[in-house]
Amino acid sequence: MKKYNNIIRSFIIVLITLFCAQSPAFAIQTISINQGHADPIPIAINKFAAESNVSRLSNNILDVITNDLKNSGLFRPISPAAFIENKTGVEHRPLFAAWRQINATVLVNGKVRRLESGNIEISFVLWDIIAERDIAGEILEMPEKLWRRAAHKIADTVYERVTGDKGYFDTRVAYISETGG
């Protein structure tokens, strides 16, 4: 009987040793994050005030700004057909309640004019509809041929002031080719 007790005792010791030596089993859980989701910021980009000699140019500038911000994925331009207030330009304070009714968070107002020098002047104001205050504004003067670059700069300013990140629309790509030995 003593022999069986020793065998049982040895067997129990082996079982306890094996049991203690094993690492605990944990369920392996894999979480895969492959994309984030943020709702685009609703932005109203109002028609820029312009005299007839620059109205087409004004529309082109507006299109570039709108496309830059929309294509960033962070902004959702509101259709101008939804606008309640129809004042254009930079000289007036917007009717914030009218812009809130169409769920705009920010508003861009602007003006384009041709100067006596032949250059164009583009001015704009960025309004925070919720806080009811302007958060950026600028007057740009340049030769007319640089209108597209000015539009990208305006989009950069809007992007930077609203998101806090540096804008990237006014960038240039350099290509360098090396030939010879």
Residue ranges and their predicted role:
Residues M1-I7:
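N-terminal secretory signal peptides that target proteins for export/translocation
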Residues S10-Q22:
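Bacterial N-terminal signal peptides
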Residues S23-A27:
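Sec/Tat signal peptide C-region and signal peptidase I cleavage site
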Residues Q29-T30, V90-T157:
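Amphipathic beta-strand/beta-sheet edge segments enriched in Tyr/Trp
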Residues S32-F96, V108-K111:
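Short beta-strand->alpha-helix linker/helix-N-cap micro-motif
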Residues N109, V173-S177:
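Residue position within the beta-strands of beta-propeller blades
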Residues H152-D170:
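Structural signature of eukaryotic scaffold interfaces centered on beta-propeller domains
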Residues K166, E178-G181:
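A flexible loop/linker signature enriched in serine peptidases of the S9 family
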